Curated annotation (Swiss-Prot):
It comes from Homo sapiens (Human). It is found in: Cytoplasm. This is DENN domain-containing protein 3. One of its GO terms (molecular function) is guanyl-nucleotide exchange factor activity. Forms oligomers. Interacts with 6 of the 7 known isoforms of 14-3-3 proteins. Inactive DENND3 is found in a closed conformation, in which the linker region interacts with the DENN domain. Phosphorylation of Tyr-858 in the linker region intereferes with this interaction leading to an open conformation and enhances the GEF activity of the protein towards RAB12. Residues 186-318 form the cDENN domain. Residues 320-424 form the dDENN domain.
């Protein structure tokens, strides 16, 4: 074995591979091999079957290693073996000295160790090296290997993304593939290998063994297959990761490893199969060569490997069968390539597409198995309710889930879900989520199946039944031997005509990656040549950047990353840091935080002086050095939900209810606490909580099990769900069960099941509880009078009457409130109240239970205590209300609103091309709604952790968000991700604007509280102009007449684009009270007017642009206590404020006619201050309120 040397004359080339350490030359010992590699073990792994001298030359071969250190960090080895004839001057034959021993060939091994699993690439490199070594003399071997190692060590590892690196290695062109994203593994192997070795059913069984963390041993007569096949299975399960010992190749001397008592995944030569099977207990033995799975002898009678959930397994098998796994069939119609490079490129392209299809297929399997996990997570308290999750699984799948849920793999998976990591699993879950699931994810009501869900269940049940009749699902534990080798089966595509649709493999065509060819390295051991190579590398990267389209930030980021690395190798630390800093505005996901931190720590005094000349760079440096303190505070624990064992005060009770997943809203939980503690000490004992929890879950389970005939479902809307069923009662419509949905009451008739509508909640006129006499007994009766029917509905509900009376009145009041306020969220809240009433009555089961439940009758009491009807003008103008805080414990203030029109962009899915409403909530949270249906489009994502001050659509592909933390975050509207940040401001970003009337603006203007104004080029994200105002307090800016109008509180300054002051409107010149300040302003160019609002004033002031020195006109706003925002909509100015509405403080909007300068309308629909306003194409106006309400109202524009 010749590739490892203790002494090296040159600086560490391996630094490229792992990017470890600062750019200074490390200690000599660190240069030889990557840290963590055991040099004593490596030789036996290079010859895992032992060293054997051969009598004739053997075929060259390669195998692959995975080396794990004590901390779990992996390095990867590719070993090439070849044989050379033995040359020895002291070899005697027939009593004479001979230079060569006849028929004696000695094995040699060359091992390349890398921090990354470049299996195919390094195999190609070693193939080229062996072509040099085999014919050369012994004394030439070392020089060739040194040259080879030095050259490899100068090749950088490509950053995550679409850019692959290409370099020449003698006769072959080598491609180093990049990982798809920073979270994904590097894939430089053929993912279809296991599918050639095992039938799909066996693949599923092996995946189950890995998911349940068994003790697994792979066997093969081919050492190379052991690593490649096991690594493929690891890739199949991404983002779930194997957490236990992973040793794909055990040498003959390491066989005792299989006696380890913990979970592991190892690989042995097939020669040791019988030995391992007899000696070790409790092992899963996987024979790659035969495509079979067996178990070590002592466990044959006690196999406990569960089956994958049936529907997911069937879908996976059908998709695998539809894959084209054989390149020969794909290329049968093609001419033979006469160019080696072209032939390899074609094969690589085919493999890339197949790998992508396999990844999609296995990822869909994982999503179908684990998608519903998120429904049983509490993110605030980091709790997973495993028991409730299991109850939602089919009985036949319980064994599978019970075993998987207890594994380290699943625990790590849960952490990622609770951290809201947007990995491949989360992205596919989002992409394949139905509209119904998106909507339901935001509702407060507990899980109840909708009519649409019930219908899909029935159809899927019929489909499964049909599948069972057509083809019996094989028992995945069935390991009957002998088996036909899968390689002998048909090579043609399986006919999947009967299982198309969701079962067919996705027709994924991956985008062709970009490639960058690394310059030639002629003499890698000569320092001058290495310096020339680095200089040439930088020059080529700089040239490539010049030819990029301005908006191609994806590729620009990769070039910047690579150039930064080369600068580091040259010792140009400041240039490297500047390139890395530019990743913030091109693609922050690939920013190498650890590398930059080590670089900063190694900077010399002159380099620090240079860095201090660049304020933006110094800010980056300070952020990097401070990050470890933030990371240490990260809480990543996961708790399983457990019932409490101690008495609970309100705070602890609220936490427990939220953890249970019953309800999150703090105000509702407070009322629930009052209900459960009526007439007793204000604390809840564990038994009461347990009874309440069980009662709630039982009614939830009953609702899941309600069987509705098709005839009944046809009368209901697709999003309706049956939330409560009475017992069988006598009514004036017949005998049956009264059913309640969120929209109506109906009678589910007995005998032949049928549907008789009682009433929708909207049409109810009166609900009364009375009694009726029957056989001298007075029976409690519920009477409901309906607007469109003469006959009053009567139901003899007996003991259920009081509860149903409460529930129907609450739903009726909730529906009336929803209609009056045009806010469907009230219906969801009323439904939650109703179901909690039901659970409270079931829990207490006492004479006072109804009174206790009445504490939850929130909307009914509200309607009785005060009229809730909105003013007529408000009702005429209000179109709809939405709640961005739905699903949160407390309402959150709506800080900023932005409407973006819909575009049919090729990069966007058709269903996502609708207009959108962006709502910025507290702490950098942004929620996006579909502005055509006002349903949730994207659950909240974060842009920093500070308050958002402003948003603007810079072009059709990106939304810019200005934050209190001085950063401008750029959101990609297609991926809904924030991969770019602009950090040129040093204080809070207060406004962002573009030129009015431009569909594709070329510039964005930003300003910050310290008075800095920047002009950004949208394509390049470079600052093209900047100026500093003479004073701070800058809150907003407007463009007009080639001037920039700036509101600084004390004045409104008109600035020329060169930064010089053109004109100024000072507040002290217009008001005697100098304690006031400008809050907001608008320019009306057609009227040549400036409209402004001032702190503490209930008036809007209007100046003429022709002469700002003239006193302003005033528009008084009646009952206004403070103004917060204003916007111009056509010939109106809308002013958002806080004022008196119906005698109480509320959010108010004043609509002022810009020509007559009079208030046309006063709109009152918010319970808290109107904090923000935005216009939707001048057809609608949207308003957002403060944290007491946290809702958005949609108003009809004039």
């Amino acid at each position: 074995m010749r590739s490892l040397r203790k002494k090296r004359e040159k600086p560490r080339p391996e630094q490229w591979k792992g990017l470890p350490g600062p750019p200074r030359a490390p200690e000599p010992e660190d240069v030889a091999v990557p840290g963590g590699v055991d040099l004593l073990t490596l030789p036996q792994l290079c010859f895992p079957g032992g060293v054997c001298v051969a009598t004739e030359p053997k075929e060259d071969c390669v195998h692959f290693l995975v080396l794990t250190d004590v901390c779990g960090n992996r390095t990867y080895g590719v070993v090439a073996q070849y044989y050379r004839p033995l040359h020895d001057e002291y070899c005697f034959y027939n009593g004479k000295t001979h230079r060569e021993c006849p028929g004696c060939f000695v094995p040699f091994a060359v091992c390349v160790v890398s921090r990354f699993p470049y299996y195919n690439s390094l195999k190609d490199c070693l193939s080229c090296l062996l072509a040099l070594l085999k014919p050369c003399k012994d004394f030439e071997v070392d020089s060739h290997i040194k040259d080879f190692a030095a050259k490899l060590s100068l090749i950088p590892s490509p950053p995550p993304g679409p850019l692959h690196l290409v370099f020449n290695m003698k006769s072959l062109q080598i491609v180093l593939p990049a990982r798809a994203d920073p979270e994904s593994p590097i894939l430089d192997l053929d993912l279809h290998l296991p599918l050639l070795c095992f039938r799909p059913e066996k693949v599923l069984q092996i995946l189950t063994c890995i998911l349940t963390e068994q003790r697994i041993v792979f066997f093969s007569s081919d050492w190379a297959l052991l690593t490649l096949v096991t690594e493929c299975f690891m890739a199949y399960l991404y983002p779930l990761q194997w957490q236990h010992p992973f040793v794909p190749i055990l040498s003959d001397q390491m066989l005792d490893f299989v006696m380890a008592p913990t979970s592991f995944l190892m690989g042995c030569h097939l020669d040791h199969f019988e030995e391992v099977s007899k000696e070790a207990d409790g092992l899963v033995l996987i024979n790659i060569d035969h495509g079979s799975i067996t178990y070590s002898k002592s466990t044959d009678d006690n196999v406990d490997i569960p089956d994958v959930p049936l529907l997911a397994a069937q879908t996976f098998i059908q998709r695998v069968q539809s894959l084209q796994l054989h390149h020969e069939l794909h290329a049968a119609h093609l001419l033979s390539s006469t160019d080696l490079k072209e032939g390899r490129a074609h094969r690589r392209s085919w493999q890339q597409k197949l790998n992508c299809q396999i990844q999609q297929t296995t990822l869909q399997l994982l999503v179908s198995i684990f998608r519903d996990v998120k429904n049983h997570l509490n993110y605030e308290h980091r709790v997973f309710n495993s028991e409730e999750f299991l109850k939602t699984r089919a009985p036949g799948d319980h064994q599978f889930y019970k075993q998987v849920l207890d594994t380290y793999m699943f625990h790590s998976f849960l952490k990622a879900r609770l951290n809201r990591r947007m990995d491949a699993f989360a992205q596919m879950d989002l992409d394949t989520q139905s509209e119904e699931d998106r909507i339901n994810g935001m509702l407060l009501s507990p899980r109840r199946p909708t009519v649409e869900k019930r219908a899909s269940r029935k159809s899927s049940h019929l489909h499964v039944t049909h599948r069972r009749m057509v083809v019996s699902m094989p028992n995945l534990q069935d390991i009957a031997m002998p088996e036909l080798a899968p390689r002998n089966s048909s090579l043609r595509l399986t006919d999947t005509a009967g299982c198309r649709g969701s079962s067919a493999v996705l027709n994924v065509t991956p985008k062709s990656p970009y490639t960058f060819k690394i310059p030639e390295i002629h003499f890698p051991l000569e320092s001058k040549c290495v310096q020339a190579y680095h200089a040439h590398f930088v020059s080529m990267l700089s040239e490539a950047m010049c030819f990029l389209a301005p908006d191609n930030s994806l590729l620009l980021a990769r070039y910047l990353y690579l150039r930064g690395l080369v600068y580091l190798m040259q010792g140009q630390l400041l240039n490297a840091l500047l390139d890395f800093q530019n990743l913030y505005k091109t693609d922050i996901r690939i920013f190498p935080t650890d590398l930059v931190k080590r670089t900063v720590e190694s900077m010399s005094a002159p380099e620090w002086e240079g860095a201090e000349q660049a304020p933006e760079l110094m800010r980056l440096i300070s952020e990097i050095l401070d990050k470890p303190h933030e990371a240490s505070k990260l809480d990543d624990h996961v708790k399983k939900f457990k019932l409490p064992k101690k008495h609970m005060q309100l705070g602890d009770f609220m936490k427990r209810v939220q953890e249970s997943g019953i309800v999150k809203d703090a105000s509702i939980i407070h009322r629930l606490f009052e209900a459960l503690t009526v007439g007793q000490e204000k604390q809840i004992d564990p038994e009461t909580f347990k009874d309440f929890y069980n009662c709630w879950k039982e009614t939830e389970a009953e609702a899941q099990e309600v069987s509705l005939p098709w005839l009944v479902m046809e009368h209901l809307d697709k999003n309706e769900c049956v939330c409560k069923l009475s017992s069988s009662v006598k009514t004036n419509l017949g005998v049956g069960k009264i059913a309640m949905t969120q929209k109506r009451l109906f009678l589910l008739t007995e005998g032949r099941p049928g549907y008789l509508e009682i009433s929708t909640f909207r049409n109810i006129e009166e609900v009364r509880r009375t009694t009726t006499t029957f056989l001298l007994r007075r029976i409690p009766t519920l009477k409901i009078r309906v607007a469109s029917k003469k006959e009053v509905f009567e139901a003899n509900l007996k003991t259920e009457c009081d509860l149903w009376h409460l529930m129907v009145k609450e739903m009726w009041a909730g529906k009336k409130l929803a209609d009056d306020h045009k806010d469907p969220h009230y219906v969801q809240q009323a439904l939650t109240n109703v179901l909690l009433m039901d659970a409270v009555v079931g829990t207490l089961q006492s004479p006072g239970a109804i009174y206790a439940a009445s504490k939850l009758s929130y909307f009914d009491k509200m309607s009785n205590e005060m009229p809730m009807t909105l003013p007529e003008t408000t009702l005429e103008t209000l179109k709809h209300k939405i709640n961005p805080s739905a699903g949160e414990a407390f309402p959150q203030a709506v800080d900023v609103l932005l409407y973006t029109p819909g575009h049919l962009d090729p990069a966007e899915k058709v269903e996502d091309a609708h207009p959108k409403l962006w709502c910025a909530l507290s702490e950098g949270k942004v929620t996006v709604f579909n502005a055509s249906s006002w349903t949730i489009h994207q659950h909240s994502f974060k842009v920093g952790t500070a308050k958002v001050n402003c948003m603007v659509m810079a072009d059709q592909n990106q939304v810019w968000v200005g934050s209190e933390d001085s950063v401008i975050y750029i959101i990609n509207v297609h991926s809904m991700s924030c991969n770019k940040q602009l950090t040129a401001h040093c204080s809070s970003v207060t406004d962002l604007i573009v030129q009015d009337g431009q569909e594709a603006p070329s510039n964005v203007y930003s300003c910050s509280m310290d008075g800095m104004v920047l002009v950004w080029n949208v394509s390049t994200l470079q600052v093209t102009s900047r100026f500093q105002l003479p004073r701070g307090g800058l809150t907003s800016i407007r463009l007009h007449g080639g001037r920039l109008w700036c509101c600084t509180g004390n004045s409104i300054m008109v600035m020329k684009m060169n930064g010089s002051l053109h004109q100024e409107l000072k507040i002290e010149e217009n008001f005697k009270d100098t304690s006031t300040s400008f809050l907001a302003f608008q320019l009306l160019p057609e009227e040549e007017q400036l409209w402004a609002a001032c702190a503490g004033r209930s008036e809007v002031y209007i100046w003429s642009l022709k002469d700002l020195a003239q006193p302003p006109q005033r528009v008084p706003l009646e009952d206004c206590s403070e103004i917060n925002c204003m916007i111009r909509v056509k010939k109106q100015v809308w002013v958002g404020s806080r004022g008196l509405g119906q005698g109480t403080p509320k959010g108010k909007i004043y609509v002022i006619d810009a020509e007559r300068k009079t208030v046309e309308k006063e709109l009152v629909a918010h319970m808290d201050t109107v904090r923000t306003l935005c216009s939707a194409e001048d057809r609608y106006v949207l308003s957002g309120s403060g944290r007491e309400e946290g809702k958005v109202a949609i108003w009809k524009g004039e």
